[in-house]
Structure formats: C-alpha cells, structure tokens
C-alpha cells in the first residue's frame, strides 16, 4: 500500500458538459443507445451481456424506421443530417470498441464527434463494420468525424423524441442540447510513468 501511494501521480482530465450535466466518457443518441434501459433486470442477471445483444436484435427493425433528422452546429461542422446515431466522445473507447473515437484523448481539450448518417444497410453497412474493426471508420462516406470544443444539436420538425445517453444516464430534457468540453476539470490519481 505504501509503495502504491509513493508511485502515484495526478493527471488532469477533461469532462464533457451537456446542458447542466457532465460526462467523462461519451454522450450518444440514436439507434440502440437506449438498449441498456430496455433490458429487464432479470434477463441481465441470467444472460449477462447476451441480454443486450438479444434486445438489440429485437429493437433494430423498429429503430431502423425512426426518423432522426438533426441539425448540428459547431465551428468545425454545420449541417442537417438524416442520422442513425451520433456520439460525442471524450475517450477512444466507446461501447466495447477500443478505438471507436480513434483521435480522442481525455486531456486534449476537445470532444470527438461522430455522426453516422442513414445508409443502405445491405450495401454500405458491411463496409462500415469492416472499417470499424480496422480503425478506419472515420473515413467512411456515411460518417462525419470531427473534433470540437462546442456543439449544438437541434431537432427538426420531423424528429420525434430521441433518447440521449450520457455515461449511462438518460438526459431527461432531450433535444436541443448544447455540448462543450471543460478542460482539465478533474484530477485523476494514476500510476507514475517513468520518463
């Protein structure tokens, strides 16, 4: 224990802010981002991670037809898109994918935004999945990937209520949202690195 205390250092890390709430890892909205809330506790207890996959398979056809047309505004990107999903990440790892946001860092002062536009599932999705496992998905034509300090996301008239998840919590007020980075907001205790 004494050695552990001796060998620690602190590192300042950024935190994301959405309206009046905060997140460390990720904010997401769109397809399948609400699965964790739909899986009954008894299924989670019996099936573990498999319960999430089964719920995703069940929900996928329903959510595929959901209209999600959103307007994104930042210095780096502005546009109105028909989307399947969008992520705002503060770290590389999202939802079990180690490099979902390959340029992200918890201490760079930026949020990484990935907008996955609606696409033809039979022709475009397989290529996107292949690129995802290679870490090349930001280059896919159905993806907008950029880094920003601030982002506003607005619903359009056609868009129904979309669940917004931030680090496992549901943002009750939904859209519109203002998202920003709070640089060096937390001090983390980590093992000392030798340089």
Task: List the model feature ranges, each with a label.
Residues 28, 32, 87-103, 170:
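Glycine-rich phosphate/pyrophosphate-binding beta-alpha loops
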Residues 43-51, 102-123:
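Gly/Ser/Thr-rich active-site loops/lids in small-molecule metabolic enzymes
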Residues 64-66, 82-84, 107-112, 147-149:
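A generic structural signal for short beta-strands and their flanking turns/coil linkers
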Residues 70, 88, 113-115:
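Generic preference for hydrophobic
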Residues 1-85:
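Catalytic core of DAGKc-family lipid kinases
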Residues 16, 35, 86, 113, ...:
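A residue-level signal for conserved active-site and pocket-lining positions in enzyme catalytic cores
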Residues 72-75, 80, 105, 115-195:
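ATP/nucleoside-binding phosphotransfer catalytic cores, i.e., glycine-rich phosphate-binding loops
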